[in-house]
Amino acid sequence: MAFKIASSPHVRKDSQTSAVMQRVILAALPGLAVQCYFFGWGTFIQVCVAIATALAAEALVLKLRNRPISPTLMDQSAVLTALLIGVAIPPLAPWYLVVIGTVFAIVMVKQLYGGLGQNLFNPAMAAYVLLLVSFPVLMTTWAAPSTLAQSSAGILDAIDVIFSAQGAADFALGIDGVSMATPLDTLKTDLSMGLTADESLKRAIFGGGSTGEGWFWVNLAYLCGGLFLLATKTIRWHISGGLIGALFVCSLFGFGASPDTHASPLFNLFSGATMLAAFFIATDPVTAATSPRGRLLFGAMIGVLIYLIRTFGGYPDGVAFAVLLANLCAPLIDYYIKPRAYGHRGSL
């Protein structure tokens, strides 16, 4: 009898890229739904435009490279990138912002480096930074939460603002009663004007609590989605735990040392894109460290950078910059923190 000798692995597990992407997209849907509830249909429209742009851009690049189109589009990595860009952009921002950002993410950051698995930076965060430095006013003017808006904007109103030139011009100037700064931006501005954190938190945008109106529930929804990813073993805990833990510890020290000039740990954890970053952005396996201890350090680095940028930097939310800086350090982390050889105990 002839025996066939095959190389390892001898036991295989079905973990196709498309299945992983589907689970991540599914886990992000509660956060998307809560964002739409508080900030209107604009978020949903931005996501739809981003997805259509991502698929078209990737198909065009693949055709130019003489690569098969259908298998690459079916892995849904472009859809996930587009989803992350769509939820990160202000809901009523002009349509060309999401188109520019998505094309840059897919063409320049992903395909120019060789496609899926070859990119050095997180495509969604690279696109966000490009838009932030190119259109700072548009990217920092968010729709007012539905609980604070003077009037409720329907889907047709959102389409009119996003796609019409007049609506885009009005949005750039700030539509009275419809658009406003984010809680992070409001707190940062108030602190620079000499107000205490406690005085700033009394503004209507904070909803009378310790977090921004609506943003607590958005972050809680992304946290629930992240727990689903952990439960299904789609992601491992190291990066998320390192990020949340480091941000909590830094916030605790800052708040304990000077509560008048520093936000509380609860505010930092449930404001901005903290939970989205912890479970859906920083955990990108392509641009993160690979070893367990390396991933823990990678996540902690992002958490510390988020806190430093939010507290001392020029931007209210430092998630995108923190992730990109950590992406740069990922190869260095892998070089110095190597996984234990198989058979050793004590690895994380």
Curated annotation (Swiss-Prot):
- Major localisation: membrane
What is any one GO biological process for this UniProt entry? transmembrane transport
Instruction: Alphabetically list the UniProt keywords.
Output: Cell inner membrane, Cell membrane, Electron transport, Flavoprotein, FMN, Membrane, Phosphoprotein, Translocase, Transmembrane, Transmembrane helix, Transport
Localization terms from the record: Cell inner membrane
Tell me the InterPro entries matching this sequence.
Answer: NqrB/RnfD, RnfD_bac
Where are the annotated coiled coils located? Answer: none
Cross-referenced NCBIfam families? PRK00816.1, rnfD
- Under which name does UniProt file this protein? Ion-translocating oxidoreductase complex subunit D
Tell me the organism: Shewanella amazonensis (strain ATCC BAA-1098 / SB2B)
Taxonomic lineage is: Bacteria, Pseudomonadati, Pseudomonadota, Gammaproteobacteria, Alteromonadales
